[in-house]
Amino acid sequence: MVKDGKTYNILYLHNESIMGGAEISLLNLVKRLDKELFTPHFACSKEGPFIDALRNIKITPDFIKFPGIRWPNPVRICNTIRGLANIIKEKQIDLIHSNQPRSNLFGAIAAKINSVPIVWHERCLERGRFDSDNIFSFLPDRIICNSGAVRNRFTKEKIDTKIRTIINGVDLNEFDPESDGSKIRKEFNIDEKELVVGTIGRIDPEKGYEYFLESARIILQDLPNVRFLVVGEASNNHSFEKSLSEMTAEKGIDKKTIFTGFRSDIPQLIASMDVVVLPSGIDACSRVLFESMAMQKPLVAANAGGTPEIVQDGITGLLVKPGDSSDMAKSIIRLLQNISLLEQYGKAGRKRVKEMFTIERNIKETENVYLELLDTNSTN
């Protein structure tokens, strides 16, 4: 499947420089690509932790601006498309994989001009009236959706055949139930007799953290031996992060709540927890769900977005009403008071990940999408 003894050159387009779920998923992909078939190249917009991570795996990206399209600037748009065309020619690109909505349209236009197939990777539930990817969904050759909920965004019947649903995967060796969380407990002065409930993710207003903190207040009324970990940092809105800290003081739970900030030792943090919570009602395919299940941790998660496709209610965790702190608290208390249920859900979660959500499966299915298009393109 190699062209003239050489690998296929894949150009990845990515606008963000932070390290969030989409960035981790993309890094997992390019690290594990079959390098006898594919050579990854990147076009990104700015320096940051994601770019540092690329350089750590010996990938040097090109830089290009992806302007917004709601208030289009014709000069900037032309410059972006011209810049992409130059990269396509210089690197002899065989296929483009656009990882974010902001780069999708520009990548598609540049791909069409240069007769190169393009894949859009859709990782979010678009909110609001202006869903540009749905509007322009006739442009890409394939659309990868990371959940059925994301797939449902695309309403045009004619594009159904080009959509592939490929759910995120997790490395079972990295997220191992035998990981040691004792150092985390020691770092934050958590007694071995205390129970730990944690949530992991970007600290943004739409992620449901206020509901998590209110549920913490309710839980502490019944179970005073519980500590709460909030793992992550704000992408932009640091004032919201500050307001959450102030909220814990107002609720009288500040001595019981720990904000860790950004952490890279996620397996150890999960290992320190007894229950992992996803309060967000807008996540399409949260990585923390797979990672927690892989480590045999039971989940309490909002019954919304792509979460019900991953968490089996009453089997690997408990699904709760989005935005309902009382329901969340009730479910967390139920698990904390039943050790056998904690273990039962945890083991079922690990089993489910091994059967359905491995990183190997995710990579293979993505490579198959590439090969579908490259085989078709070579015969045209």
Protein language model annotation of sequence segments:
Residues 23-28, 195, 199-221, 242, ...:
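A conserved mid-protein helix/loop that constitutes part of the nucleotide-sugar donor-binding site
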Residues 176-190, 243-246, 363-365:
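A short helix/loop element that forms part of the nucleotide-sugar donor recognition site in Leloir-type
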Residues 98-104, 122:
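Short His-centered aromatic/hydrophobic patch
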Residues 43, 298-301, 311:
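Short hydrophobic beta-strand element within catalytic cores of glycosyltransferases
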Residues 241-261:
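Nucleotide-activated donor-binding/catalytic signature segment of Leloir-type glycosyltransferases, i.e.
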Residues 118-148, 157-158:
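A conserved, positively charged/aromatic
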Residues 262, 281:
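Aromatic "clamp/platform" in nucleotide-sugar-dependent glycosyltransferases that forms part
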Residues 313-314, 318-325, 334-339:
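Conserved acidic donor-binding segment of nucleotide-sugar-dependent glycosyltransferases
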